[in-house]
């Protein structure tokens, strides 16, 4: 996995609370088990006016020209609620998002985000209100999200957030569960060599 230390990116404001995983990636697109290819269906029922996904909704935020290429999603409370599908962070990262900033996240989505190198940043509702206003009033504004310093820098101000030290360590070093295991490969090999032949 790629390391996440600092990210600078354009911000798209999704001004909606309780965005559930079925809205993020509708159930009809869940047939695959690989992580790629879901971005084209991200927010499908909101981004498109037809079932085939051919007619863009001109009023949806991700279809507006000013937010094309956004890599940071600004959202409202309880983002990622609903079913526990891991396809939700897959769709967000496949679309190009690296960070989601919101007042709160559903627990399962929050964990799945870290597992897929998508950084969920929690800020107060007051800070989120300020950031929404900032983005809407300043076309093309970019935020600097620094995981080492645990800050979001925007509009000349710094907003502090907290990430569990273990999850922070994993993201900064690009470690998933396999990577964590491989850090102990030498000890695992030494242990295996000590086992009786019939257990090897």
UniProtKB/Swiss-Prot annotation:
Quaternary data: Heterodimer of LeuC and LeuD.
Protein name: 3-isopropylmalate dehydratase small subunit
GO molecular function, one term: 3-isopropylmalate dehydratase activity
Family as reported in the entry's similarity comment: Belongs to the LeuD family. LeuD type 1 subfamily.
Pfam families listed in its UniProt record: Aconitase_C (PF00694)
Primary gene name: leuD
Gene3D superfamilies given in the database record: Aconitase, domain 4
Organism: Yersinia pestis
Described function: Catalyzes the isomerization between 2-isopropylmalate and 3-isopropylmalate, via the formation of 2-isopropylmaleate.
Gene Ontology CC entries for this record: 3-isopropylmalate dehydratase complex
Source taxonomy: Bacteria, Pseudomonadati, Pseudomonadota, Gammaproteobacteria, Enterobacterales
Pathway, per record: Amino-acid biosynthesis; L-leucine biosynthesis; L-leucine from 3-methyl-2-oxobutanoate: step 2/4
Superkingdom of origin organism: Bacteria
Keywords noted in UniProt: Amino-acid biosynthesis, Branched-chain amino acid biosynthesis, Leucine biosynthesis, Lyase
Record EC number: 4.2.1.33
PANTHER family: 3-ISOPROPYLMALATE DEHYDRATASE SMALL SUBUNIT, 3-ISOPROPYLMALATE DEHYDRATASE SMALL SUBUNIT 2-RELATED-RELATED
Catalytic activity: (2R,3S)-3-isopropylmalate = (2S)-2-isopropylmalate
InterPro entries: 3-IsopropMal_deHydase_ssu, Aconitase/3IPM_dehydase_swvl, AconitaseA/IPMdHydase_ssu_swvl, IPMI_Swivel, LeuD
BP term (GO), one: L-leucine biosynthetic process
């Amino acid at each position: 996995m790629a390391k996440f230390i600092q990210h600078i990116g354009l911000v798209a404001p999704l001004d909606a609370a309780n965005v559930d995983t079925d809205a993020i990636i509708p159930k009809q697109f869940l047939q695959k088990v690989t992580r790629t290819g879901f971005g084209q269906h991200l927010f499908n029922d909101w981004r498109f006016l037809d079932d085939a996904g051919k007619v863009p909704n001109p009023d949806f935020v991700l279809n507006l020209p000013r937010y094309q290429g956004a890599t940071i999603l600004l959202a409202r409370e309880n983002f990622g609620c609903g079913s526990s599908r891991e396809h939700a962070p897959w769709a967000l990262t496949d679309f190009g998002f690296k960070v989601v900033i919101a007042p709160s996240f559903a627990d399962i989505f929050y964990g799945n985000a870290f597992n897929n190198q998508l950084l969920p940043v929690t800020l107060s509702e007051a800070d989120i209100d300020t950031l929404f206003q900032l983005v809407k009033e300043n076309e093309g504004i970019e935020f600097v999200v620094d995981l080492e310093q645990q800050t979001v820098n925007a509009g000349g101000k710094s907003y502090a957030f907290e990430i569990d030290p273990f999850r922070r360590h994993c993201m900064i070093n690009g470690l998933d569960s396999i990577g964590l295991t491989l850090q102990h490969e030498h000890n695992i090999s030494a242990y295996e060599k000590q086992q009786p032949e019939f257990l090897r």
